[in-house]
Amino acid sequence: MNLNRHYLLPLLIAMLLIPAQDLSAKKKKQVKEPTDRELWAGVLYRMAEPVLSNMSEGKLQQNMLVELSPTWDGRNKKVTYMECFGRLMAGLAPWISLPDDDTVEGAQRKQLREWALKSYAQAVSPESPDYLLWRKEGQTLVDAAYIAESFIRGYDALWVPLDSVTKQRYITEFTQLRRVDPPYTNWLLFSATVESFLCKAGAPSDTYRIASALRKVEEWYVGDGWYSDGPDFAFDYYNSFVLHPMYIEPLEIMTNAGKNKVWNMPDCDYNRAVKRMQRFGIILERFISPEGTLPIFGRSITYRTGTLQPLALLAWSCLLYTSPSPRDKRQ
């Protein structure tokens, strides 16, 4: 009897623990997984917070660690800060321009927008430690174009609220970039983007720089949604990084302004350009493997997280094609 009791007690304890452990496992399984939107909103915030929280206080250049490639070409390393800020804001602008709401995401957007507005001011204030490298370097044209693109995409939320001094400083900095003579590549569109933003903002703009760039890119269309990056076609992702977005956006601005009649350029048609970008979007969609990866080809492959920019623009503009379905592209 004593022997039975000796074994019975551990058995009873074990029987009591098993359901408890099982219940604990069920509770763990019931932890709410983030939605796709919550996941990507979190990624956006983690990318943007270190840059904008520092730059809003004029501390980006002080605190940002810069690593140079072993094949670095010797250019001024301060171009890094403009590249960092400009490309971040070009991608971030549509999201943080959404109306405020009471969600966690809404609070994140509001905070980033507040930091961004302060950072824009720091970028053009000669007294700021984070005054960007606007002068001398030719590379500045590239990254300034992404800042201009952020203003195009978030005009009411990011440009309009800036004070008059900051706005005039941007107009001055953008205007002096005409000193850069862009090569006959996608660089023509950097000039066109800057000048079309000036037009949108009501500042003096160089219409020739816009029109000549758009005409040249139109000449470079090779078919099936692809543009050549200059006279010779290159199989890379620059149709995603530059050619489609920075062809569509200036063309839309100038078409809405009625400027295409002034240019007498019926060859540059906005609706046709959209159809080409839709076709390119289908190709991009079919590049994606079942594992969610993209094929690696062409130069600047480290930028490949930007390869889906045309798809993002189409979705944002409600211009997504019907096959594959919009839901597939969101997934």
PLM regions: where:
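Single conserved hydrophobic/aromatic residue that forms the stacking wall/gate
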Residues: 321-331
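Aromatic-lined, polymer-binding surfaces characteristic
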Residues: 81-82, 92-95, 109-277, 286-312
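Loop/turn-rich, solvent-exposed surfaces of beta-rich toroidal or solenoidal domains
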Residues: 313-317
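Low-complexity, Ser/Thr/Pro/Gly-enriched N-terminal "stalk/linker" regions
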Residues: 26-84, 94, 114-118
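Bacterial Sec-dependent N-terminal signal peptides
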Residues: 1-28
